[in-house]
């Protein structure tokens, strides 16, 4: 049984993330597992990263339910220590195959002995979380940060 891990901050969960989760599901197969690991899980609300871990988890679960995709969601707190990140994260998401489109993350996991499935995303430039967050803020006509969330 293959266990595939998709790691990200998901601020917010967007189409690029959806493509990664679908690729993980395909790689895991019918008998496998998909784990979505939410980074920066300790982070509280802030204007640049407006969703809490529970809100990000709700986005992911709602999407997965609509897509009929079974997955596990776990949170991972930041430790700001790249050399020890993989060991720290593995305690939360378990062992498996990392499915990612992020080269630095892929390199970090491979250096720790992980198998990594790289996924090419054709719209990476437009499907970056910071662009999505900026667009949402620009489209909002509400100036109260709590209301805009």
How should these model regions be labeled?
Residues 1-149:
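Nucleotidyltransferase catalytic core that binds NTPs
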């Amino acid at each position: 049984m293959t266990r595939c891990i998709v790691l990200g901050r998901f601020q917010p969960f967007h189409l690029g993330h959806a493509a990664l989760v679908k690729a993980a599901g395909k790689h895991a197969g019918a008998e496998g597992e998909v784990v979505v690991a939410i980074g920066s899980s300790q982070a509280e609300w802030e204007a640049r990263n407006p969703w809490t871990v529970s809100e990000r988890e709700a986005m992911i679960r709602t999407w997965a339910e609509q897509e009929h995709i079974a997955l596990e969601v776990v949170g991972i707190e930041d430790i700001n220590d790249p050399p020890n990140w993989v060991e720290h994260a593995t305690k939360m998401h378990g062992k498996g195959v990392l499915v990612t489109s992020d080269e630095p993350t892929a390199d970090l996991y491979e250096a720790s002995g992980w198998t990594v499935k790289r996924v090419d995303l054709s719209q990476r430039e437009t499907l970056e979380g910071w662009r999505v967050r900026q667009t949402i803020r620009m489209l909002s006509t509400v100036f109260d940060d709590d209301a805009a969330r």
